[in-house]
Swiss-Prot record:
Reaction catalysis annotation: adenosine(2503) in 23S rRNA + 2 reduced [2Fe-2S]-[ferredoxin] + 2 S-adenosyl-L-methionine = 2-methyladenosine(2503) in 23S rRNA + 5'-deoxyadenosine + L-methionine + 2 oxidized [2Fe-2S]-[ferredoxin] + S-adenosyl-L-homocysteine; adenosine(37) in tRNA + 2 reduced [2Fe-2S]-[ferredoxin] + 2 S-adenosyl-L-methionine = 2-methyladenosine(37) in tRNA + 5'-deoxyadenosine + L-methionine + 2 oxidized [2Fe-2S]-[ferredoxin] + S-adenosyl-L-homocysteine
InterPro entries xref list: Aldolase_TIM, Methyltransferase_A, RlmN_N, RNA_MTrfase_RlmN, rRNA_lsu_MTrfase_RlmN/Cfr, rSAM
Protein name per UniProt: Dual-specificity RNA methyltransferase RlmN
Active site: residue positions: E128 (proton acceptor), C402 (s-methylcysteine intermediate)
The encoding gene: rlmN
Species for this entry: Novosphingobium aromaticivorans (strain ATCC 700278 / DSM 12444 / CCUG 56034 / CIP 105152 / NBRC 16084 / F199)
Length: 429
């Protein structure tokens, strides 16, 4: 890169490399009241904060254990609800700390039951999360960044600029909010008002079925806004809390992290997080993948597939998922399908392929492949002995489907969203 430009043309943003895997143009703005949000912090750090605030080491460790339990097992958002902590201690905690959640700006429900939330950070940046209910599972699609830097051509999020990384608290806070909305904390831990604010029609008759034993939220996919491996430390720390047996206690086998191919971070992902891996492949030739997934210009298909072959823990029991969006006349021919099979076999990958019908958005430069073309592609892969299900689009009517996140916040002005949020709060009393 030149040290100085002598003309007014703006140079394109370079694709970040392994030297700086977290390209962040903006830092998190501290809370105005100076209090520290405990959500997203491990027990050890909570104990250290309590000690710094004046508790002796033994008391700090005990209080941290108690608070951690109330945060992640009970889902409370108020220190006064922590009944095994002395009443005199609760105001002391409330003066210094806060139990945060991302602010809910808007909640939408699709005709197919998919739910999408437009959320806002404490420093006023918007992002989205999606809950997808199925007959045998409920999957939460979690965001890792506000915006994205990868510029994948078929993805609406890719047209956004990257604002900043989400913190561990903002990432795990999405899971907490979903549990609020689904009533998945032990009965009585939170009231129905929280669920109503989160966009769920909740009444006393529902309370018996919406419990943690009901497991409405069973799976997490890091497939929302952003590239998780460009926010590796924060994603890792958040998922450790989600998987902690004393935390949210979700098995790593029920968590999938999706990457567009940040090769230098993939091994660390397997070693330090250990969750299932999904790779946004989307093309099998250099020219096409260079166009639609520009990070391919830095980490090519062969390098990416070798990293998949080396991924810790990958096996026939824990296959790597390749995501493949079906784009008309771009990556959907029978020859493309046969090349996909060849590559998977060449690298001896324990893999399955999710074929994703392209979900349109305003101004998108591509169209979805026809149903017959998708079927032909899928049959070639399936007949080679590789699972190749065609994903049923979910939440298209509320722009919550794969590749559509961004639209809700673009359609409405910030002022209109603020007005709607105020009206909702006023209606709740």
């Amino acid at each position: 890169m030149r040290a100085m430009q002598t003309h007014t043309e703006i140079a394109p943003m370079p694709i970040p490399g392994h030297v700086d895997p977290v390209p962040v143009p903006r830092e998190v703005t501290p809370r105005e009241d100076g209090r520290i949000d405990l959500i997203g912090l491990p027990r050890k750090q909570i104990a250290e904060l309590f000690a710094q605030a004046g508790l002796d080491a033994k008391a700090a460790k005990l209080r941290a254990k108690q608070v951690f339990h109330w945060l992640y097992h009970r889902g409370v958002t108020d220190f006064d609800a922590m009944t095994d902590i002395a009443k005199t201690m609760r105001p002391w905690l409330a003066e210094r700390f806060v139990i945060g959640r991302p602010e809910i700006v808007e909640a939408q429900v699709s005709t197919d039951g998919t739910r999408k939330w437009l959320l806002r950070t404490a420093d006023k940046h918007d992002f989205e999360m999606v809950f997808i209910p199925d007959a045998d599972r409920g999957t939460l699609c979690v965001s890792s960044q506000v915006g994205c830097t990868l510029n994948c051509r078929f993805c609406h999020t890719g047209t956004m600029r990257l604002v900043r990384n989400l913190t561990p608290g903002e990432i795990v806070g999405q899971v907490m909010l979903a549990r609020d909305a689904l009533g998945e904390w032990p009965k009585g831990a939170n009231d129905s008002r929280v669920a109503t604010m989160a966009g769920l029609d909740f009444d006393d008759e529902d309370e018996g079925s919406y419990t943690s034993d009901g497991r409405l939220l069973t799976n997490i996919v890091m497939m929302g806004m952003g590239e998780p491996l460009y926010n590796f430390d924060n994603v890792r720390d958040a998922l450790k809390l989600v998987m902690d047996g004393d935390g949210l206690a979700l098995s790593k086998r029920r968590i999938t992290l999706s990457t567009s191919g940040v090769v230098p971070m993939m091994e660390r992902c397997g070693e330090e997080i250990g969750v299932n891996l999904a790779v946004s492949l989307h093309a099998v030739t250099k020219d096409v993948r260079d166009e639609i997934v520009p990070i391919n210009r830095k980490y090519g298909i062969e390098e990416l597939l070798q990293a998949c072959a080396d991924y810790p823990g990958a096996s026939n029991a824990r296959r790597i998922t390749f995501e493949y969006v079906m784009l008309k006349d771009k990556n959907d021919s029978d020859d493309h399908a046969r090349e996909l099979v060849r590559l998977i076999r060449q690298y001896k990958l324990p893999a399955k392929v999710n074929l994703i019908p392209f979900n349109p958005w305003p101004g998108a430069p591509y169209e979805c492949s026809s149903p017959d073309r998708i079927k032909s592609f899928a049959n070639i892969v399936f007949e080679a002995g590789i699972s190749a299900p065609v994903r049923t689009p979910r939440g298209r009517d509320i722009d919550a489907a794969c590749g559509q996140l961004k639209t809700a916040s673009e359609r409405k002005s910030r002022a209109e969203l603020d007005r709607l949020a105020e009206e909702k709060l006023a209606a709740l009393g």
